[in-house]
Regions:
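Low-complexity, acidic Ser/Thr/Pro/Gly-rich terminal tails and inter-domain linkers that flank the onset
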Residues: 1-43, 47, 122-126
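Short, solvent-exposed, Trp/other aromatic-anchored flexible loops in extracytoplasmic proteins
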Residues: 48, 63-126
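A short beta-turn/strand-edge loop motif at beta-sheet boundaries
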Residues: 49-54
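Beta-strand signatures of extracellular beta-sandwich domains
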Residues: 56-60
Length: 126
């Protein structure tokens, strides 16, 4: 029996923006071999001394030659309790709006800490 999902693309490991409280430790694009749908998965790692309770990422779908497929989508990781050096997000499948997506760019745009303070990416480059 064949695998349900095929890996189509992997992000470079440990993507970081200066001053960010997290790194994108890993990312993959998976194709569902039963439905044809495409999903992204990200593994984020807290590198801040503060506990994270929520994070928002932005994902830009790209086609086979790296051209954007529409606007970037946002995805929120909620109800977290991620302490320093712990990972989150790897079990969340983020549906891509276009089934022709073959790669993507990702960035963390906001992190909310347990003390309700907020980090915003502003012009951070991942």
């Amino acid at each position: 029996m064949s695998e349900r999902y095929s890996k189509v693309f992997s992000l470079s490991e440990n993507l970081y923006a200066e001053g960010a409280p997290v790194v994108i430790a890993a990312g993959a694009l998976l194709k569902d071999n039963q439905t044809g749908r495409v999903v992204a998965q990200l593994k984020l790692r807290n590198i801040s001394p503060k506990t994270i309770k929520a994070a928002t990422v932005s994902i830009l779908s790209l086609n086979t030659v790296g051209n954007p497929l529409g606007e970037a989508i946002r995805y929120e990781y909620l109800d977290l309790s991620s302490t320093r050096d712990t990972d989150f997000g790897s079990k969340s499948a983020i549906p891509m709006p276009d089934i022709t997506t073959r790669s993507f760019n990702a960035a963390v745009v906001e992190v909310i800490f347990a003390d309700n303070s907020i980090w915003n990416a502003s012009e951070a480059v991942w």
